[in-house]
Amino acid sequence: MEYNHQEIEAKWQKYWADNKTFRTGTDKNKPKFYALDMFPYPSGAGLHVGHPEGYTATDILSRYKRAQGFNVLHPMGWDAFGLPAEQYAMDTGNDPAEFTAENIANFKRQINSLGFSYDWEREVNTTDPNFYKWTQWIFTKLYEKGLAYEAEVAVNWVEELGTAIANEEVLPDGTSERGGYPVVRKPMRQWMLKITAYAERLLEDLEEVDWPESIKEMQRNWIGKSVGADVTFEVAGTDKSFEVFTTRPDTLFGATYAVLAPEHDLVDAITTPEQKEAVAEYRRKASLKSDLARTDLSKEKTGAFTGAYAINPINGRKMPIWVADYVLASYGHGAVMAVPAHDERDWEFAKVYGLEILPVVEGGNVEEAVYTEDGPHINSEFLNGLDKAQAIEKAIEFLEEKKIGKKKITYRLRDWLFSRQRYWGEPIPIIHWEDGTSTALSEDELPLVLPVTSDIKPSGTGESPLANLTDWLEVTRADGLKGRRETNTMPQWAGSSWYYLRYIDPNNSEALADPELLKEWLPVDIYVGGAEHAVLHLLYARFWHKVLYDLGVVPTKEPFQKLFNQGMILGTSYRDHRGALVATDKVEKRDGGFYHMETGEALEQAPAKMSKSLKNVVNPDDVVEHYGADTLRVYEMFMGPLDASIPWSEEGLEGARKFLDRAVRMIENSEIKAENNGELDKVYNETVKNVTERLDLMYFNTAISQLMIFVNAVNKAKALPLEYANGFVQLLAPFAPHIAEELWVKLGNEAGISYVAWPTFDESKLIESEVEIVVQINGKLKAKIKIAKDLAREELEKIGRESVAEALEGKNVVKVIAVPNKLVNIVVK
């Protein structure tokens, strides 16, 4: 008999809401557990089945920890500023605030339908002035510390979006992550955050957190620490010079040309008249490319000769100076010494332009291919014969002694481009005065509320639409000095860089959060979300947290103690013979195969990311309606390891529902007795032990497997002790909370399973109390019998003879060999 999931789930969701069951515990005598989801951007599309995977994981842990006696903070909120809402508003003429509010209501409805145990009294919304007052407050603190500053920088400008975007938001093909629009480089006045001031700490403190090694490595690579030397090169025949940063000063003898970034200040001054036109044209083309496109290793190398030469400081040789876009103005000093024998990009460039390739490390044929392995130095005078480490040390000594270079540490990490030329974001709380000074708003002037307007199209001047709102824009100080508010707004990353702190004290109007509460709840114990946020969000949040730590606002160096990245739930999709993906509505199934409806071509089934274009997005509303929220939760946790990417399967969903139906039948149909005959002792105690251990490890799929093993065992047993029925329902509750609440009451318990103490297991019951032995006559198997474990030899012999009494009739027993817990062999004549 199937249970009515719609009725049961609605009933218990109402019970939890009415009773405020999941209000955060405040008992100071209990340990704390802070389970955090990466809060969603509330898009118009609503949730898809990928969202609940991570949310279910944190919900299971939260329910488990409540039952273990923890105060649990499990909140949810909305990352609601940003480009998508504004783009939608511009396309449709709707107000982004209204659109966002509708989307949030829909997301909240969907989330509640899945039975997640969020404390909704903690809900935050990044677009709420009571929230972004503190985002702005953090900005003013960054400004006071010199960590927020204005600079004229070449930005990634996207004409279609009317805004500049960060390097991290530019795709490898040179288009924008949002919308796939062309990105061009354009100098503009921008707000920058000095994340580089924290580079070393961001690197070092990765050792203190329990994060996937792959994510740590991505952050290390993004920060990109390099130890090397700054080397000064003079320009031949002039009084000019430039600096180069190199991680390999030991290869200076192999430097045969120099390359300047197209934006380098020296280019105009040193380019000869004959080369001016070619260099100017090259620089123009380079200005249209993004940094990512320029540094793409696979692209063909291009450049222009300046006509000038540098002097190699280690041997006095002249080296031609080129301009090439594979060198970025923002890295090192915007100049490189090219060692084509031992650097792939330099080698490719040298091959294109016929430049000298001089090996200085032994091994390989550098005319045929670049040699990047280690080896003894050659062609390097006083460095000859030394290995890499020795040669680097000696080269730096030489440079410092001659005052032509010095040891240097650099980072790939660039300062964070923080301003956006858009409307739908937090206003930056700065006023620019007509006397050329700028001031930040004081705390009592915050929040600086985003003004309501129907005109949110980009201004076209490079400023945001706020530049059009003169009533809001123009201010006059008490002494009559006139000023203009900052018109740029903050990027979407701003609110998400600190939102986890506001959950701790969401209604505080006097401070970002109460220091005592921050001390009580930080750091976050488990943070679950997608690996796509490895660099941006996680790095920015760590940076802001460290600034707040330095200000004495937060008590911990790191925000998130443990990070877990759930895998992706893939959709069903199909490929044709060319490997092209075919939308599901163009596919028909017949004769056990899949065919293109229009062409009749046989297609291959292949999992792919769910997308609207492939029409393979599964809406959780449909799953909840047909199968129930508990089924969806159990299925998504049973699909495989939580961090694996696995294709969605309707059959798997049906399997999860069948398991829940069997669990219900087990409770409803078993003979449940107060007394215990011991028959299920071992499997029950194993189940409690295994489920508990696997929850601690987040091995949710194998925890569910163990629950299935228990159900199978009960179906073969004569009776189910009430204690074990209750215990099973408690173990099921984190995974399938609605049906567990229902079964809990059916077993005669008071409503409300959430805070009932988690079951414990008896170690002694994990040991088999019975063993199966074989009984042989003259070495031939005659019977298998179950007996009490560790019986004395005499007792064993007696039971063995009795079990084969018929076969022994008329025979003369010579001797009986009994091996405890194994066998009885009766020798007869």
Curated annotation (Swiss-Prot):
Q: Which family does it belong to?
A: Belongs to the class-I aminoacyl-tRNA synthetase family.
The motif 'KMSKS' region: which residues? 609-613
Enzyme Commission code: 6.1.1.4
Residues the record lists as binding ATP: 612
The UniProt entry, under CDD domains, shows: Anticodon_Ia_Leu_BEm (cd07958), LeuRS_core (cd00812)
Q: Offer a single GO CC term for the protein.
A: cytosol
Q: Which domain of life is it from?
A: Bacteria
| Source species of the chain | Lactococcus lactis subsp. lactis (strain IL1403)
What protein does this entry describe?
Leucine--tRNA ligase
Q: Which UniProt keywords apply?
A: Aminoacyl-tRNA synthetase, ATP-binding, Cytoplasm, Ligase, Nucleotide-binding, Protein biosynthesis
> Which parts of the sequence form the motif 'HIGH' region?
40-51
Please write the reaction equations for the catalytic activity of this protein.
tRNA(Leu) + L-leucine + ATP = L-leucyl-tRNA(Leu) + AMP + diphosphate
